[in-house]
């Protein structure tokens, strides 16, 4: 009897857990292997060539787990490495897509702030997407160096201090729409809404997950709250710190907060 489809997820740290949580909401028979490269996090301020090498190494490690496909559950990794690695690996390599398109389509002519790492902001992938949508003048790039690292350490009070002046400036500029271009930032939605209550937040997790499941021909029935997902997962964190394993468990459990 054929077993569950086995897929790999990778991220520089904790951000991709937000994608794993989304996958687990579906009543699907999947076996997910999650690899958090905490030893080398954060990726967001590194050189593109270094990120490519790191992501390549993680994908090789995931191949050793006999996965059938890999999702780079990290916008920075996707921007820096996805195009190259798709040519190098025999299994499908999927990546993240910032939810710029739905934000633009639902708010024609309105300013859209894009919170992302410096690498994601500068890479050609994002520039091509903005050009395709004719959105160069509407997208306000907001680089957030160091913010993902605060999530990896569970320092949410520090993350709020970091975000307050950014959100204040966006309010003053009458920005009403915010795209989260980093999977780490999904875990900061509650902080963003606390400091900017009326902002509309967009992220690419849902669209990416649906694309992944469609491409792999996996059924997409969302589980009821009382039901249990058919998926199982394995966490691999290349960290010796107990904090990281404890935080990963908390991030996967606190559904209402995050």
Swiss-Prot record:
Pathway: Cell wall biogenesis; peptidoglycan biosynthesis. SUPFAM superfamilies: Aspartate/glutamate racemase. Substrate binds at residues 11-12, 43-44, 75-76, 183-184. It catalyses: L-glutamate = D-glutamate. Pfam families: Asp_Glu_race. Transmembrane segments: none annotated. Its EC number is 5.1.1.3. The active site is at 74 (proton donor/acceptor), 182 (proton donor/acceptor). Keywords: Cell shape, Cell wall biogenesis/degradation, Isomerase, Peptidoglycan synthesis. GO terms for molecular function: glutamate racemase activity. GO terms for biological process: cell wall organization; peptidoglycan biosynthetic process; regulation of cell shape. InterPro entries: Asp/Glu/hydantoin_racemase (IPR015942), Asp/Glu_race (IPR001920), Glu_race (IPR004391). Provides the (R)-glutamate required for cell wall biosynthesis. Belongs to the aspartate/glutamate racemases family. This is Glutamate racemase.
């Amino acid at each position: 009897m054929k077993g569950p489809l086995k897929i790999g997820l990778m991220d520089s740290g904790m951000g991709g857990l937000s994608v794993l949580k989304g996958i687990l909401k579906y009543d699907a028979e999947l076996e997910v292997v999650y690899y958090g490269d905490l030893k080398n996090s954060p990726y967001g301020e590194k050189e593109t060539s270094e990120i490519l090498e790191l992501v390549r190494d993680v994908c090789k490690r995931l191949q050793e787990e006999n996965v059938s496909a890999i999702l780079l559950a990290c916008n920075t990794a996707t921007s820096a490495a996805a195009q190259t690695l798709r040519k190098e690996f025999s299994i499908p390599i999927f990546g993240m897509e910032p939810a710029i398109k739905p934000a633009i389509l639902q708010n024609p002519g309105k300013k859209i702030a894009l919170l992302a790492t410096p690498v994601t902001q500068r890479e050609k992938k994002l520039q091509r997407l903005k050009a395709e949508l004719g959105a160069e003048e509407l997208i306000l790039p907001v680089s957030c160096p160091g913010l993902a690292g605060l999530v990896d350490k569970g320092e949410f009070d520090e993350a709020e201090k970091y975000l307050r002046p950014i959100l204040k400036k966006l309010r003053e500029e009458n920005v009403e729409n915010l795209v989260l271009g980093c999977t780490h930032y999904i875990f900061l939605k509650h902080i963003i809404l606390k400091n900017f209550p009326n902002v509309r937040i967009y992220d690419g997790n849902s669209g990416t997950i649906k694309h992944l499941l469609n491409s792999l021909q996996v059924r997409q029935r969302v589980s009821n709250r009382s039901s249990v997902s058919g998926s199982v997962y394995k966490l691999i964190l290349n960290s010796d710190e107990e904090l990281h394993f404890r935080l990963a468990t908390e991030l996967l459990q606190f559904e209402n907060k995050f």
